[in-house]
Design a protein with these regions (language model features):
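FAD-site-proximal beta/loop scaffold in flavoenzymes
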Residues: 125-147, 217-226, 231-304
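A Rossmann-like FAD-binding core segment of flavoenzymes
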Residues: 34, 79-96, 103, 170-264
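FAD-binding core/adjacent interface of flavoenzyme oxidoreductases
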Residues: 1-10, 67-152, 226-229, 239-241, ...
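Rossmann-like NAD(P)H-binding beta-loop-alpha module
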Residues: 140-188, 222
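Beta1-alpha1 glycine-rich phosphate/pyrophosphate-binding loop at the start
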Residues: 2-77, 166-187
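Residue-level detector of alpha-helix initiation sites
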Residues: 16, 42, 114-116, 136, ...
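Cysteine/selenocysteine-centered motifs that mediate thiol-based redox chemistry or coordinate metal-sulfur cofactors
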Residues: 141, 319, 391-409
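Mid-to-C-terminal Rossmann-like scaffold of FAD/NAD(P)H-dependent oxidoreductases
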Residues: 2-8, 27, 281-379
Length: 409
């Protein structure tokens, strides 16, 4: 067993949020004499957001690196790749890794992320059935796109759309299957979803909504997808993009309180005062988190807490804005997408220019926004939603954006 110099910090996982925590700790001036990161992936932290750009051949793999090795040496941070923590002993305050290494800790942080959800379909174990989650997945998809022609992406959320567009850019014929009646149904209303579908089809993607697979067919290699209406789609590759679930098994085995994720308080502390969690593996109140922005906010909160910064307000989940670009079509969504009984809707659309907007207003406050095509006003709308600003003076011009409203005021 390795005896850590007290106090020692051990971090389980090295994704973007864990890396942000390390940077915040360094910037704040942490009290730890030793920081050790155990990472299940073969690579140190990289920009996971750019995986879709890598798949689409828009960036090089080297551009995904967040920090060079010299940064970790400079700040005396030890990173062990391909070595996930496999057991936590809270009473003894030590962890065991996949290699059999045992290490004592003063403070432990769980940043174990999330895993792709499976549908439990017959044939999911066939060769050619994949997920799109990490750099290893992306490398495999790039390789297969060089030797295969047809792909089916199951799931019309943002990850599925990014996978589909990346494979299309690599020259594959791609079909998107989505169970809901419109794409991005958690971020867009039906009108925006229909416009998005039309634009993707214009770019060469096949989009089937309101349908779902019942089986993946083939002997050893996947050869087709059977749909609920009996249709059979021939394919060489299937990408499952049907959501994620928090990686909580390690915490559960250690006796930590878990629900959908590892439960934490506003300081990102679990049911054990010496163990913290953040990012996709954690749950705060009823919220779990699939985007990097709240994870970065959690990293800032936890860094202040671990560095004992006074006046740390704690983590408060707000309205999370979704920003992405599919086939060069920018998309923004923040807040609710469906009007309530006391909601006023402001809506505009230019189908020919692939532009759509919806604003939801309640009691002179902007509560929700959807933008497709022209997202130049997204930062302003996002700030209005988060601040709860009275928009009475902008009511008749808010759809034209901040510069117009300021000039007209």
């Amino acid at each position: 067993m390795e005896h850590a110099q007290a106090p020692a910090l051990v971090i389980c996982g090295h994704g973007m949020v864990a890396q942000r925590l390390l940077e915040q700790l360094v910037a704040t001036g942490h009290p730890f004499s030793r920081i050790v990161v155990f990472n299940g992936e073969p690579f140190a932290a990289y920009n996971r957001i750019q995986l879709s750009s890598l798949l689409a051949n828009q960036v090089r793999e080297s551009e995904l690196e967040l920090k060079p090795r010299s940064w970790f040496r400079q700040h005396k941070i030890e990173v062990y790749n391909r070595e996930p923590v496999t057991a936590i002993e809270p009473q003894q305050r030590r962890v065991t890794t996949a290699s059999g290494r045992t290490l004592a800790y003063h403070t432990l942080v769980l940043a174990t992320g999330a895993s792709p959800s499976r549908l439990g379909l017959p044939g999911e174990d066939l060769d050619g059935v994949m997920t799109f989650r990490d750099l290893t997945d992306t490398r495999t998809l790039i390789h297969r796109a060089q030797t295969h022609r047809r792909a089916v992406v199951i799931g019309g959320g943002f990850l599925g759309l990014e996978a589909a567009e990346g494979l299309r850019a690599r020259g594959m014929d791609v079909t998107i299957l989505h169970r809901s009646g419109h794409l991005l149904n958690r971020q867009l209303n039906p009108a925006a979803g229909e416009l998005l579908k039309h634009q993707l089809q214009q770019r060469g993607l096949t989009v089937l909504t309101g349908t779902e697979p019942t089986a993946l067919l083939g002997k050893d290699q996947v050869q087709a997808v059977q749909l609920s209406d009996g249709t059979v789609l021939a394919t060489d590759l299937v990408v499952l993009a049907t959501g994620i679930h928090p990686n909580k098994a390690l915490a559960e085995a250690a006796g930590l309180a878990c629900n959908r994720g590892v439960q934490v308080d506003s300081q990102m502390t679990t049911s054990n005062p010496h163990i913290h969690a953040l990012g996709e593996c954690c749950q705060f109140q009823e919220h779990t988190f699939g985007l990097v922005e709240p994870g970065y906010e959690q990293a800032a909160v936890l860094a202040r807490h671990l560095c004992q910064v006074s006046g740390n307000p704690g983590f408060t989940p707000g309205e999370i804005a979704t920003r992405l670009k599919i086939s060069d079509l920018p998309i923004f969504s923040c807040g609710p997408i469906t009007p309530g009984p006391h909601t006023e809707t402001i809506e505009w659309q230019d189908y020919a220019q692939a532009v759509y907007g919806q604003l939801l207003v309640e009691h002179n406050r902007l509560t929700g926004a959807i933008l497709l095509g022209d997202t130049s006003s997204a930062p302003w709308y996002s700030e209005l939603i988060r601040s709860g600003t009275d928009i009475s003076r902008y009511r008749d011009t808010i759809a034209f954006g901040k510069p117009y409203c300021d000039a007209a005021a």
